[in-house]
Swiss-Prot record:
The keyword Chloroplast does not apply. InterPro entries: MIOS/Sea4, MIOS_a-sol, WD40/YVTN_repeat-like_dom_sf, WD40_repeat_dom_sf, WD40_rpt, Zn_ribbon_mio. CDD domains: mRING-H2-C3H3C2_Mio. It is found in: Lysosome membrane. Belongs to the WD repeat mio family. Zn(2+) 2 binds at residues 788, 835, 838. The gene is MIOS. This is GATOR2 complex protein MIOS. The lineage of its organism: Eukaryota, Metazoa, Chordata, Craniata, Vertebrata.
Length: 875
């Protein structure tokens, strides 16, 4: 409080009262006006609140500072510091029959008159009142008074005097304080430290000082100019703020040598700083002649790493009103609420709205925090958008081990839910590629095995100018059609399309039977027709019509096919051309398009986008010449790449074109999971090293880690290292000799495998293997196992007492377990250890180190056991 500018204080125990003090004390009552009109005489504070004047106290002139008594009773007791140094206890509407009525009007008088700058009630012992005064060369500047002490004339000199000539009541003048501190210096600000009622922090003339009332002869201090407005963070009692001119300093009392943080200097002098009582680490500052209050959020302030490192804060500004602000006061309980007052006593009730912090979990849960409230976004019961999200799909697929089946590759589409036809086509394509690559490598190693994974586009290009057409008879018709002679490359293309199986026998019968079993009647009939077997096509349609889930319209189509005639101007051809446009099933449409097409012109079949790519490509391999086929495959490949259609992998293979196609697919769907598994399946090394492929793989690994699917990520890494040996990282940790510092494991001939993260030696578990019990560099003996006392490197199976009779391990069945049992493990605290198998056996029943006289609780030091992989948590 400075000059005649008003200050404002909230009542500590009445959330609806505050006092404005300048030349007089005015008590106001705040009430809500949401559902009521503004009362006569009330002052509008905001749209939702108004203030009513309850009482005015003009008995204490020359006010310089005011402090509200912290206890509930008496409820309206205030201490007023005056320009002459006196501290007067006064009240606003105090009941005169109260047992504390003797406190009203009590004065505390220093020896020498000078201005009282600050007052502070002790939060623990509420009867103690600290006063900070200006400097006097013969007096102390920090006086601590006990407002309820029982004085006697022998101990404390007292006198009763009249306040004025016209008054009849007398008051008690107290002239002897409990404590006197800060001699020959000025005190500009005060605050008690909440953690101890005996500690007082004072902003003196040139330093901040901490006084311990248990030993007043000593004090802890730090030289600084920032001695005004000292205030303690109510949520972090070791954090203190003070200011000087336009700069705020933040102190940590545990490291009191210098400020831990200095806020940005303001162009105008500061007049007030205050911590928010309802929000952790929120500091408000006000400068002279300003209508802006600056807020500094230290909630997320990191701990400084070095002496010169300053933590960062979040700064923002709010404007409660248009006029200059004289002072403000935080509400003690309402969140982020404050009252501001202008120099002409205009008041505003203002709430600082929090920044909304959003958190989107890796499992698509959305939450946000606003103030003390935490909100969660829940999906509507009938809203299936969450199930359609690719992140949810990838998470469920990861749980089902999607992509990890390397034997029956086609099964991966079932693990994906068997809902996406593109995924089904992709995994069947990869399955056929793997199958025929292995078959070709067995017949002619190094010949054409790699060509299979290059896709049909490359296969077709390798056979240009080698194929001629010939006429073939229809089955069920007296007719012949031109069909290309199938060379080895076209047969391979048909095999990749799934129409025929291994061998040179071009028989689509097994494929038709599989389609019939799956209920794909229309597709089976179309494939039979494309192979010039109209009789088989009609039989399939009739079977489909008579099945439980069949369509009776298939009978109509079968009847239409049975009346096929080769005459160009026939009524049948005219009616079928019209009927084709009315059919919904694409395979029925292309059947009539094929029958009504001119010789060599099959656009109605080749460009029907609803027909599977593999069927269109197989059709093209049977009916198009080399030039037409190459042109068609090139055009279809470009369409698939642009659309990101996974069926196009059949054409591009796992080549650079395949990466381009997969890039479009990932851009469209975000499915890095499928992209990663697909590219790992059989891509050459130059494709695997493509930046895009590595980006998909690393993002999928990070995604698994974010979901806490650490086991799944480990399985993926193992799967990746099998298909791409170059991806296996080098060992990052090895056991070194204590004497020479060289790696023990590198020269161990008995080691069949190097484990990631551990070094192992002599681990085969077979007594015939050589033992490495000494350092290969300096020949010093290796440490001994704390349990069997045999040098490390000796296999557990050959250690005496290595296993009990009832704990025999079948090493032939569990070789990996035998290797792990021989690993050397040790405690990072006490450095004791031994064979991993022995240590596991010991710590099943004990928590303490097995070494005598060692009291280390080795097993309890490892906290990683508390982390539970997400896939093991039951929903």
């Amino acid at each position: 409080m400075s000059g005649t500018k008003p200050d404002i204080l909230w009542a500590p125990h009445h959330v609806d009262r505050f006092v404005v003090c300048d030349s007089e004390l005015s008590l106001y009552h705040v009430e809500s006006t949401v559902n009521s009109e503004l009362k006569a005489g009330s002052l509008r504070l905001s749209e939702d609140s108004a203030a009513t004047l309850l009482s005015i106290n003009s008995d204490t002139p020359y006010m310089k500072c005011v402090a509200w008594y912290l206890n509930y009773d008496p409820e309206c007791l205030l201490a007023v510091g005056q320009a002459n140094g006196r501290v007067v206890l006064t009240s606003l509407g105090q009941d005169h029959n109260s047992k504390f009525k003797d406190l009203i009007g009590k004065e505390f008088v220093p020896k020498h008159a000078r201005q009282c700058n600050t007052l502070a009630w002790n939060p623990l012992d509420s009867n103690w009142l600290a006063a900070g005064l200006d400097k006097h060369r013969a007096d102390f500047s920090v006086l601590i008074w006990d407002i309820c002490s029982k004085y006697t004339p022998d101990i404390v000199p007292m006198e009763k005097v009249k306040l004025s000539a016209g008054e009849t009541e007398t008051t008690l003048l107290v002239t002897k304080p409990l404590y006197e501190l800060g001699q020959n210096d000025a005190c500009l600000s005060l605050c008690w430290l909440p953690r101890d009622q005996k500690l007082l922090l004072a902003g003196m003339h040139r330093n901040l000082a901490i006084f311990d009332l248990r030993n007043t002869s000593q004090k802890m201090f730090v030289n600084t100019k920032a001695v005004q407005g000292v205030t303690v963070d109510p949520y972090f009692h070791d954090r203190v703020a003070s200011f000087y001119e336009g700069q705020v300093a933040i102190w940590d009392l545990r490291k009191f040598e210098k400020p831990v943080l200095t806020l940005t200097e303001q162009p105008k002098p500061l007049t007030k700083v205050a911590w928010c009582p309802t929000r952790t680490g929120l500091l408000a500052t006000l400068t002279r002649d300003s209508n802006i209050i600056r807020l500094y959020d230290m909630q997320h302030t990191p701990t400084p790493i070095g002496d010169e490192t300053e933590p960062t804060i979040i700064e923002r500004s709010v404007q409660p009103c248009d006029n200059y602000i004289a002072s403000f006061a935080w509400h003690p309980t309402s969140q982020n609420r404050m009252i501001v007052v202008t120099p002409n006593r205009t008041m505003s009730d203002f709430t600082v709205f929090e920044r909304i912090s959003l958190a989107w979990s890796p499992i698509t849960s959305l939450m946000w925090a606003c103030g003390r409230h935490l909100y969660e976004c829940t999906e509507e019961e009938n809203d299936n958008s969450l199930e359609k999200d690719i992140a949810t799909k990838m998470r469920l697929r990861a749980l089902s081990r999607y992509g990890l089946d390397t034997e029956q590759v086609w099964r991966n589409h079932i693990l994906a839910g068997n809902e996406d036809p593109q995924l089904k086509s992709l995994w069947y394509t990869l399955h056929f590629m793997k199958q025929y690559t292995e078959d070709m490598d067995q017949k002619s190693p190094g010949n054409k095995g790699s060509l299979v994974y290059a896709g049909i586009k490359s296969i077709v290009k390798s056979s240009l100018g080698m194929v001629e057409s010939s006429r073939h008879n229809w089955s069920g018709l007296d007719k012949q059609s031109d069909i290309q002679n199938l060379n080895e490359e076209r047969i391979l293309a048909l095999q990749l399309c799934g129409w025929i199986k291994k061998g040179t026998d071009v028989d689509v019968g097994p494929f038709l039977n599989s389609l019939v079993q799956e209920g794909e009647w229309e597709r089976a009939a179309a494939v039979a027709l494309f192979n010039l077997d109209i009789r088989r096509a009609i039989q399939i349609l009739n079977e489909g019509a008579s099945s439980e889930k069949g369509d009776l319209n298939l009978n109509v189509v079968a009847m239409a096919l049975s009346g096929y005639t080769d005459e160009k101007n026939s009524l049948w051809r005219e009616m079928c051309s019209t009927l084709r446009l009315q059919l919904n099933n694409p395979y029925l449409c292309v059947m009539f398009a094929f029958l009504t097409s001119e010789t060599g012109s099959y656009d109605g079949v080749l460009y029907e986008n609803k027909v599977a790519v593999r069927d269109r490509v197989a059709f093209a391999c049977k009916f198009l010449s080399d030039t037409q086929l190459n042109r068609y495959i090139e055009k279809l490949t470009n369409e698939m790449k642009e659309a990101g259609n996974l069926e196009g992998i059949l054409l591009t293979g796992l080549t650079k074109d395949g990466v381009d196609l997969m890039e479009s697919y990932v851009d469209r769907t975000g499915d890095v999971q499928t992209a990663s598994y697909c590219m790992l399946q059989g891509s050459p090394l130059d494709v695997l090293k493509d930046e895009r492929v590595q980006y998909w793989i690393e993002n999928y690994r990070n995604l698994l880690d974010a979901w806490r699917f650490w086991h799944k990520r480990a399985e993926f890494d193992i799967h990746r290292s099998k298909l791409d040996p170059s991806s296996k990282p080098l060992a990052q940790v090895f056991v070194s000799c204590n004497f020479c510092g060289k790696s023990i494991s590198y020269s161990c001939s008995a080691v069949p495998h190097q484990g990631r993260g551990f070094s192992q030696y002599g681990v085969s578990g077979s007594p015939t293997k050589s033992k490495v019990t000494s350092c290969p560099g300096c020949r010093k003996p290796l440490p001994r196992c704390a349990l069997c006392l045999i040098n490390m490197g000796t296999p557990v199976s050959s250690c005496p007492g290595g296993t009990k009779s009832d704990e025999k391990v079948d090493l032939s069945k569990d070789k990996k377990l035998a290797q792990f049992n021989n690993w050397f493990t040790w405690c990072h605290n006490c450095r004791h250890g031994g064979h991993a198998g022995h240590m596991l056996s010991w710590f099943r029943d004990h928590a303490e180190c097995p070494v005598s006289a060692c009291t280390c609780k080795c097993m309890q030091l490892d906290t990683t056991g508390n982390l539970v992989p997400a896939e093991t948590v039951q929903p």
